[in-house]
Regions:
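Outer-membrane beta-barrel proteins
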Residues: 2-17, 22-210
Length: 210
């Protein structure tokens, strides 16, 4: 993940949002394969033409998993775990995510993730630390407000503390013959990517029980 003029992490974002939008529900053990015409994470470009894959486990609200993507100079490998539950009409979650790299593309990110959802709206917050191996450690907070209905979603998100910048996504995800398809319009501001940027991204994926 590259953020605000700094090399930064996570990639559950784009493909994960599309899988949720298309109504994918996990079993106890599940796996996924995906491809994106461009890999952007949290509004920041990572790589053209990127393949990815992951394995997840969920039971009784607890979840854990790993996800990897091609970033050109090696792989990004994410690990995560947490717990989610419904309290009345509100869904709540708390978890941890670590972003690691096999090559020189980026350094390690680690963060605590908090989430809340009510009706069509969801709010996600991540409080993290960037272990910049060539410089001082940096702290960041990420926030995202998402509105989702019938496969369509809109998201406004951004960073604060040592990272800065904002972006906006409009997307649609659907499933055709058990294949997940998605399209995203992404608008990133100049604080996030050095110059304002607009992108159209296409994704395809397959999720299956193990």
């Amino acid at each position: 993940m590259k953020a605000a003029n700094i090399t930064s992490p996570v990639k559950l974002g784009l493909i994960g949002s599309l899988l949720l939008a298309s109504g994918f529900a996990q079993a106890d053990w599940s796996a996924n394969l995906g491809y994106a015409s461009e890999y952007h994470y949290r509004g920041i470009f990572q790589k053209n033409s990127s393949a990815s894959g992951g394995v997840d486990y969920e039971t009784g609200g607890f979840y854990a998993g790993t996800w990897a993507a091609d970033v050109g100079d090696g792989l990004e490998v994410d690990g995560y775990f947490g717990y989610g539950a419904d309290v009345g009409d509100v869904s709540l979650s708390v978890g941890y995510t670590g972003y690691f790299y096999t090559g020189d593309f980026d350094d390690t990110y680690q963060e605590i993730n908090l989430g809340a959802g009510f009706g069509l709206l969801s709010l996600d917050v991540a409080v993290g630390e960037y272990e910049n191996f060539s410089g001082p450690t940096q702290d960041y907070t990420y926030y995202a407000l998402t509105l989702e209905k019938d496969g369509f979603y809109g998201k406004y998100a951004g960073f604060s503390q040592d990272f800065e910048g904002n972006y906006f996504e409009l997307g649609y995800g659907t499933t055709v013959s058990e294949i997940d398809l998605g399209i995203v319009l992404l608008f990133s501001d100049s604080d996030l990517v050095g110059d304002s940027d607009e992108n159209i991204i296409f994704t395809i994926g397959k999720a299956f029980d193990l």
